[in-house]
Amino acid sequence: MRSLSGLLLLLTACLAVNASSVPTLPDDIQVQENFDLSRIYGKWFNVAVGSTCPWLKRFKEKMTMSTVVLIAGPTSKEISVTNTHRRKGVCESISGTYEKTSADGKFLYHKAKWNITMESYVVHTNYDEYAIFLTKKLSRRHGPTITVKLYGREPQLRESLLEEFREVALGVGIPEDAIFTMPDRGECVPGEQDPVPTPLSRARRAVLTQEEEGSGAGQPVTNFSKKADSCQLDYSQGPCLGLFKRYFYNGTSMACETFLYGGCMGNGNNFLSEKECLQTCRTVEACNLPIVQGPCRSYIQLWAFDAVKGKCVRFSYGGCKGNGNKFYSEKECKEYCGIPGEADEELLRFSN
């Protein structure tokens, strides 16, 4: 469920946002199929967030992972929400209630002070591992806001779940640079204060650049020199907190695979596209790999080397989980796999 105090703080700041800066709120939000309310109860860690609210990007460096506990509410029509988080160096806990609706997986929160009703939807969950919540708010005066949050039963989640969350957020119009993970500083006890930094740590912080600190505010860094020399490195997410989709070359599978880049530092095995990755890192050994369409259904017409026929052939690439035997033109395929051109073939016939 939405982090209650974090949600209210976010939406308060967003009241000053003009409606023209955010997308139209979707009307056809699909909740988790066969939603089971009793299984969503318990403690969740707020692992990642994305929002159309510009305030979020300005203050995301101050946000850390919080916990949310959901239990049955004081009435059969409500659920209770308790959020525990750090705010201004002090751990605090705030409780509230959400109203059930006739649609399973959809809840309402009404703030009389602002005369705003927020709608929250459980769009994806497997109950035991993760849950993705989408909240939309419409202010008649200031327009719509969409916020998506990823929760986990544990502070760390599989990268495939982070990718699923990212796709959900992008799908409702949230910009890529407004989607990020929450730094995990551990759970806190309400009332306790964060330790005061020592003079030594203050001095060290003063000389660090924003990228070295890993604030999450840095821009993607991909201008490494001699990127081909980095192809055998393991991928590096870097210390920042963004969720930027990138490609890295896997020397074992001889394929370019996706990973989520934090937005700063990392290494040179980091590419914006599969094409750039393959054309930088692929070797001639790729010509001996099988032709793999992959499970996705984009049906992109590419070229591959057919080792049985001994020539380059067209094939339909699904768009994901292929291998290095994938070329973007017939010429490229022939150059990699040693197929002679027409002039070369004529020369060979003449010399024989």
UniProtKB/Swiss-Prot annotation:
Protein origin, superkingdom: Eukaryota
Keyword Cell cycle attributed: no
Modification(s) after translation: The precursor is proteolytically processed into separately functioning proteins.
Residues with site note (Inhibitory (P1) (chymotrypsin, elastase)): L241, G242
Coiled-coil segments on the chain, per record: none
Domain BPTI/Kunitz inhibitor stretches: 231-281, 287-337
Binding positions (3-hydroxy-L-kynurenine): C53, K111, K137, K149
CC per GO annotation: cell surface; cytosol; endoplasmic reticulum; extracellular region; mitochondrial inner membrane; nuclear membrane; plasma membrane
Keyword Membrane: yes
Cysteines paired by S-S bonds: C91-C188, C231-C281, C240-C264, C256-C277, C287-C337, C296-C320, C312-C333
Signal peptide residue numbers: 1-19
InterPro entries, alphabetized: A1-microglobln, AMBP, Calycin, Kunitz_BPTI, Kunitz_BPTI_sf, Lipocalin_CS, Lipocln_cytosolic_FA-bd_dom, Prtase_inh_Kunz-CS
Glycosylation sites per record: N115, S215, N223, N250
Tissues showing expression: Expressed by the liver and secreted in plasma.
Record key words, sorted: Cell membrane, Chromophore, Cleavage on pair of basic residues, Cytoplasm, Disulfide bond, Endoplasmic reticulum, Extracellular matrix, Glycoprotein, Membrane, Mitochondrion, Mitochondrion inner membrane, Nucleus, Oxidoreductase, Protease inhibitor, Proteoglycan, Repeat, Secreted, Serine protease inhibitor, Signal
Site description Inhibitory (P1) (trypsin), residues in chain: R297, S298
Gene3D superfamilies the UniProt entry points to: 2.40.128.20, Pancreatic trypsin inhibitor Kunitz domain
Alphabetical list of PROSITE patterns matching this protein: BPTI_KUNITZ_1 (PS00280), BPTI_KUNITZ_2 (PS50279), LIPOCALIN (PS00213)
EC number: 1.6.2.-
MF GO annotations: heme binding; IgA binding; oxidoreductase activity; protein homodimerization activity; serine-type endopeptidase inhibitor activity
CDD domains in the cross-refs: Kunitz_bikunin_1-like, Kunitz_bikunin_2-like, lipocalin_A1M-like
Protein family membership: In the N-terminal section; belongs to the calycin superfamily. Lipocalin family.
Name under which the protein is recorded: Protein AMBP
